[in-house]
Structure formats: structure tokens, C-alpha cells
């Protein structure tokens, strides 16, 4: 008999498969729901090199490899500049790498997606919340 509290163990291969199918701004809600279905409770994506860390129950964690060259992240978060870069990307005016460069110049260290609350939070290097968005 399997315990109802048993942890769901997901792999980086499963996440990569979902990302290949649903990993775009247009399909973000479906992507996050699919991650939740795998057992991912939260993930952090780091602007400096594009790697992500995925967390599940019982301390389960998997890490993706870097996806681009290392970008220097500004020491101080600049909210208005950050929002300009983010909005340009949301309008499909920039590539992922161009957005990442803009976020790094704006002092954004990472974003965190919570699959339960369907939120995405952007943080600067000091750990300050720069923006919390509902994923819809």
C-alpha cells in the first residue's frame, strides 16, 4: 500500500519535456500547472546564467544546467527599468536572452514561481520583492 503522504519524485528530464512543449510566455499558465502535476511546488530561475532549481515535497530538488553565458547582475535593483524590460518581453519584442540581459542590468537576481498560488515573484540581489504577479 502506498502512503498518501509519499513524495512525488520528478526528474529534470520530465521538466525539460514540459519546457520544450509549454515553456513560453504564451503558455506559462499551462506550464506551471503541468509542473504542479509532476509534484513541483516551487522553482527559482536565476538571471545570471538561466539555470533553474525545482523543489518538491520532502526536500526533493533538481537543478537544470545554465542556458546562457554568465551575465553580471547589478548590485541595486532598479524597479522601473526592470518593468520596462519585462513588459517588452511580454509583448514579444525581445528574446529570452535579451530579457535576461535587461533584468540583469536592472538588478534582478531571480524569479520564483509558486505552483500552488500560481504566482511569480521577482527579487533583486538583496532579496527584496520587486514584483509579484498572478499567473493567469
Where are these regions (language model features)?
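Short, solvent-exposed interaction modules
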Residues: 62-111
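Short, flexible domain-boundary/linker segments around small modular repeats
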Residues: 2-31, 36-37, 77-94
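Long, charge-rich, low-complexity intrinsically disordered regions
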Residues: 2, 43, 67-68, 133-136
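Acidic (E/D-rich), amphipathic helical modules within compact regulatory domains
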Residues: 30-70
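Charged, low-complexity surface segments at secondary-structure and domain boundaries
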Residues: 1, 16-17, 67-72
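Short glycine-rich, low-complexity/disordered patches
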Residues: 25-37, 46, 91-118
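Short acidic-glycine loop/turn motifs at beta-strand connectors
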Residues: 48-49, 56-58, 116-117, 124-127
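Glycine-rich, aromatic-bearing surface loops/beta-hairpins
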Residues: 122-136
Amino acid at each position: 500500500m502506498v502512503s498518501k503522504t509519499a513524495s512525488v519524485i520528478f526528474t529534470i528530464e520530465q521538466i525539460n519535456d514540459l519546457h520544450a512543449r509549454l515553456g513560453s510566455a504564451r503558455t506559462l499558465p499551462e506550464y506551471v500547472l503541468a509542473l504542479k502535476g509532476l509534484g513541483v511546488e516551487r522553482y527559482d530561475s536565476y538571471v545570471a546564467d538561466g539555470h533553474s532549481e525545482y523543489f518538491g515535497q520532502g526536500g526533493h530538488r533538481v537543478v537544470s544546467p545554465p542556458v546562457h553565458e554568465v551575465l553580471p547582475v547589478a548590485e541595486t535593483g532598479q524597479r522601473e527599468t526592470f518593468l520596462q524590460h519585462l513588459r517588452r518581453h511580454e509583448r514579444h519584442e525581445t528574446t529570452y536572452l535579451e530579457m535576461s540581459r535587461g533584468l540583469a542590468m536592472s538588478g534582478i537576481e531571480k524569479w520564483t514561481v509558486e505552483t500552488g498560488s500560481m504566482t511569480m515573484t521577482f527579487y533583486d540581489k538583496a532579496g527584496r520583492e520587486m514584483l509579484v504577479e498572478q499567473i493567469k
